[in-house]
Amino acid sequence: MRVKEKYQHLRRWGWRWGTMLLGMLMICSATEKLWVTVYYGVPVWKEATTTLFCASDAKAYDTEVHNVWATHACVPTDPNPQEVVLVNVTENFNMWKNDMVEQMHEDIISLWDQSLKPCVKLTPLCVSLKCTDLKNDTNTNSSSGGMIMEKGEIKNCSFNISTSIRGKVQKEYAFFYKHDIIPIDNDTTSYTLTSCNTSVITQACPKVSFEPIPIHYCAPAGFAILKCNNKTFNGTGPCTNVSTVQCTHGIKPVVSTQLLLNGSLAEEEVVIRSANLTDNVKTIIVQLNQSVEINCTRPNNNTRKRIRIQRGPGRTFVTIGKIGNMRQAHCNISRAKWNNTLKQIASKLREQYGNNKTIIFKQSSGGDLEIVTHSFNCGGEFFYCNSTQLFNSTWFNSTWSTEGSNNTEGSDTITLPCRIKQIINMWQEVGKAMYAPPISGQIRCSSNITGLLLTRDGGNNNNGSEIFRPGGGDMRDNWRSELYKYKVVKIEPLGVAPTKAKRRVVQREKRAVGIGALFLGFLGAAGSTMGAASMTLTVQARQLLSGIVQQQNNLLRAIEAQQHLLQLTVWGIKQLQARILAVERYLKDQQLLGIWGCSGKLICTTAVPWNASWSNKSLEQIWNHTTWMEWDREINNYTSLIHSLIEESQNQQEKNEQELLELDKWASLWNWFNITNWLWYIKIFIMIVGGLVGLRIVFAVLSIVNRVRQGHSPLSFQTHLPTPGGPDRPEGIEEEGGERDRDRSIRLVNGSLALIWDDLRSLCLFSYHRLRDLLLIVTRIVELLGRRGWEALKYWWNLLQYWSQELKNSAVSLLNATAIAVAEGTDRVIEVVQGACRAIRHIPRRIRQGLERILL
């Protein structure tokens, strides 16, 4: 019986506690609803192509062509350039698909076209030239201290030109290099200028020097340039050391083939870069870690001669006048440095193509003179140097020794013989030729070799060797060797993310901006989590606008400082276009914020619920373990949908606010006491009184008219007419009263004012009685509601006390049952232990008793 009672008690206790736990579980399991929140100034970017502008420290007074071009096209450089390192950011780069290379290529073409603009068409010189070899009076090259030109390298040509007198011709002579003329019908004495049959030859302006200056490429506001700082970056793939800059480093636009001159060096080891190392068609770009100096000179002290070939001013052909000596132009390179460079390059190539490979460097396999030789511009003259001595070695896989002319020569200097051409095939356009006027005096230039352009022979080489030859010709590879670590991205400052905050539709409050935001740069928080990056929104949003303003100021300063030289060329139009684009993008973002009801806000809550199908991550995962870049990639497919929902929600909210404002007069009871409203109330009161008086007058007139029509004379308005009695009630005599005493007495008044006052009094009494009845009804309702509410509160209080007592009793019962069970269990354990102890203690007695029985 006792066990049964305990079982029933535990059963009741289990039901109570089970019900309570189930309710608590249902309450706790209810997930808190999330809402979309808009953030402005988030560190998010996307790959983009935009119009870049250039910056340089060009000197307006310098006539060097690069300075002139940069003065017209570029803005001054920033004296304090900033570079912000993006911590915990990994970005993919691809130097072979970089729009910056294409833009620089177009710009350098513009530079050459503008700098070497043609002054004179040489069509009159496309005639038959009678040429002979220039005699060499020097018989030895040792005494002259240099290499002697080959016989026939320079031709002395004569030709006829028109004079100022019509019908007369004049015979002139000029010196031409062998490669600038071609024989006519294999005749050794009759020649014509090369390219006369394929293009129109024009002569560049003679007053030209040619020394490239560094040019910086800058991104407009709203865009940024990402820079990869990995020291061994091969140009493609992910980069873990990323920073953001507004402008690139200074790049010298040196046009050359085979060898890259005056570029940037690798910080550690030699770096090999190629779009596909297994494809022999692709060019291999080698970046050196140590520069090799190359000194070039044209020793012969030539003079210039001018020949008028056409009527009119400026129609002058400039050619070589006198040749000081016949020493050949050449370039000198240190043999030890070059061999050390090839050794490092061969080592890196073996890492790519196999450690057991033998690396062989050979001369160019053929083609145009610009490709076969190392071509470049030195002091205004175009040099074409034979690079066979540079690329004529074999590097074995074990000894790493060399074979070829590099070791057979005993001198410490490699001397490259060079040719000079005056008729140049322009690299920027096929079929275009230009005559570069000769430069008088000696020419010397010193450059640094910072890279190589190589090509690999194709085919199946089973002999364990790889052959590499110098290449070039596509100047995009030259620019690519400097722009490999840059990419342009578009800033996307608008971001959406879920939060617990919902937009309130009450009156707006002033927004307080936190002062704990640190200056990290516009994209400095890109690697931080979303929660940490949201602290820098103020700085980033401010810098987005300040970047636009700063660039506008830079442009205005450039125009003011160089207004006498600045011309609105194609470059000027491109710069204006870039800035207008930046302003338009900023205004577009501000327009979206305005449409969403977020104008002037960095963090803007909305009334759009967050859909778990967009992202099922928890708030802790989103804000503490996710960057804005990762988050943008995750919800990129739903961004347009979220934006449209925010717009719809804002439209609905504005509609609701409009409807609420229409009821604002009823909500603001204090406005009833405004003097303007009181004047309106008095006006309404006067209109009501006037209406009542007018109705009374109308009815009185109608009554008089009615009585006159019936033959009665009009009575006073206040004449009291007796109430007619019924047919069963006799009139009686005057003395016989009784019944008439019960008739209602009516107060009679005299005068119109008294009549008006009586009507007003009746109206006020009527209003008073009705308002009193209404007030009594309202009081009764409030009293009833208060009584019912109080009873409900007392009921809920009693219910709460009851359940509290029940919970208390259940807890006490549980504790009692637990105590009883523990006590009973303890008693059983004690009894068992006592029995065991007694049994052990009685063992000797039992043994003694057994022995006694045996003995007895």
From Swiss-Prot:
Glycans are attached at residues 88, 136, 141, 156, 160, 186, 197, 230, 234, 241, 262, 276, 289, 295, 301, 332, 339, 356, 386, 392, 397, 406, 448, 463, 611, 616, 624, 637, 674. Belongs to the HIV-1 env protein family. This is Envelope glycoprotein gp160. The gene is env. Residues 706-856 are cytoplasmic. Residues 633-667 form a coiled coil. The record marks 511-512 as: Cleavage. One of its GO terms (molecular function) is structural molecule activity. A lipid is attached at residues 764, 837 (S-palmitoyl cysteine). It comes from Human immunodeficiency virus type 1 group M subtype B (isolate LW123).
